[in-house]
UniProtKB/Swiss-Prot annotation:
Keywords: Cell cycle, Cell division, Septation. InterPro entries: SpoVG, SpoVG_sf. It comes from the Bacteria. It comes from Bdellovibrio bacteriovorus (strain ATCC 15356 / DSM 50701 / NCIMB 9529 / HD100). Belongs to the SpoVG family. This is Putative septation protein SpoVG. The gene is spoVG. HAMAP family: SpoVG. PANTHER family: SEPTATION PROTEIN SPOVG-RELATED. GO terms for biological process: division septum assembly; sporulation resulting in formation of a cellular spore. Could be involved in septation.
Amino acid sequence: MKVTEVKVFPVNEDRLKAYVSITLDNCFVVRDLKVIQGTSGLFVAMPSKKRKDGQFRDIAHPLNQETRAMIEDLIFEAYEKELKSMGETLVSLKRQKAPGSDYGNDDY
C-alpha cells in the first residue's frame, strides 16, 4: 500500500491544528484525519465516530505500528510544508503517540 496523496487543511482552533485527507494507491480516500495538539506534542488522530456511550471509536485505522508511522510521517511532512507555504513555521515538530492507538482492537 502506498499513500499517493496527502491534503492538509489547517484550522485555527485551540487543539485542532488541521484536517487531513489521504489517498491510498490513487484509488481510495480516507478523510477527516486530524492533527491535534496534545499535552506533550502533536499527534495524528484517525477518523472517528462518537458512540452512544460518549466514547470515540476509530472508523478506520492502521493495523500495525509500521503503517501508522508511515502515515504519520507523511502527514507531519505535509503539515509542516503547508505551514511554511502560509508563512508559519514550527520551531520543533514535537510528536506524541496518539491516545488510544491500540492496533487491531476493533471491539465495539
